[in-house]
Amino acid sequence: MKRTLSLLAICTGAILSAPSYAACDLGDLEAEGKISLLSNSYPVLKHFSDKMKECEASKLEIKNKLVGGSAVQEQARIVLSSRRGNSPYDVIQVSAQSYHEFLLKEQIQPITDLVEKYWDEYNLADIPPSIWDLARHGGEIYALPIQLNMQEFFYRQDLFDQHNLEVPHTYQEVVTTGQALQKAGIDYPLSQAMGKGWNLATEFTNIYLSLGGQYFDEDGKPLFDGEKGVEAANILKSLLPLMSPNALSLSNDLVMVNFQQDKAAMGNVWATRASEMDNDQVSKVVGKVNYSMAPTANKNTTIPATSIFWDGYVFPHRLNSDRELVFKIMMESMSKENMKEGAELAFLSRQSANQVEGEQYRYLGALAEMIERGAKPFPSEGYYGLAHTEIGNKLPDALRGRTSIEVALNEAAEGYYKEARAQGYID
């Protein structure tokens, strides 16, 4: 099977990868000191981190810290907000969400001069302008895009075939399909990350965007507690009978394990988890999981209930090391050859890396299709993270029936507005 994936109008995401077929070449730069990276730990980013370490030399140590879940962004906030000396990390991996937050707070530095200097040497034109635009602000480039990531629909092809089921295209169809699987003896057919906090707020965002919802008005005042917000939350609530009793504590890692251990039949899952479905060292379902577009919120919309998410590498405003050396190391880890090697793990930013063959790349087709169908980017307002936090913390009680959805969303909106004013985002 061959996938030739156009980046089309990917006005939202990417991946600058990291393996290397040749030794790391730092040219005539003085390779000494210690370079450190703070990054998330999921497979594709660990892959890049490992390739960075190939640049170590007798006088150059590369010490990377990989942490799970949203902890990387929490640690980055602490590091970047500190006014005491230089950052302990030379490179920090950011998400689409945290990038805009750090940019507005002027905590990261532009790297336009280095991008231009090494443009030809590393064939950076291979990354489309729409991808570079993600990292551009006021004419300056502030990040090296790493990858495009989206949640897509994972499903057990063998179980769907066995029970003559069609892949659901709306969340109502997900519920109907789940009920059919339950009748067939599968108690908890659905698994997706709906744990309190970041994960649940992300699922809410996916459905809210599919409904055409806008988070804020032009002045930054909240809109997510309106009719579409209530509908999005009710759709989430309708999924709980299909999920295990610990549904509201499920993380992305736990969802991945559920699929690997034959405890899930379907769910909206991050595309970067797809390669682990076929990892025969840990998975019991090798070759059995297939991929489709994320379902839409309802039959009246064609927008997939997902968010185009991107990750990138940024340099702290107060950088301790030689910034050109740090940049060169990142370029070596993101070479054309390295990105091609990493295509199995994620959707890469270089156009040349997206012509791939093999069943291990079968998850990529759904990503391209969702982009064509109008999938929305993750909200980019610098203050969006405040709303995300409030929703993730307030909504679980409503989904458990301890309060109404309307009350929970109103409280989240009030909490967001108060904090956004306190931090000076809005008047």
Language-model features and meaning:
Residues 23-25, 96-150, 203, 288-294:
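Hinge/lid segment of periplasmic solute-binding proteins
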Residues 54-127, 162-169, 258, 265-266, ...:
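Extracytoplasmic "Venus flytrap"/periplasmic binding protein-like
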Residues 79-82, 87-90, 120-158, 188, ...:
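A structural signal for short loop-to-beta-strand junctions that line the ligand-binding cleft
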Residues 112-127, 189, 194-195, 211-231, ...:
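Short, solvent-exposed loop/beta-turn-alpha elements that line the ligand-binding surface or hinge
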Residues 137-146, 151, 175-222, 264:
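Extracytoplasmic/periplasmic solute-binding protein
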Residues 177-184, 219-248:
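Glycine-centered hinge/linker elements that transmit conformational signals in sensory
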Residues 202-203, 234-321:
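Extracytoplasmic/periplasmic substrate-binding proteins
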Residues 272-286, 297-393, 421-427:
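C-terminal lobe and pocket-closing loops
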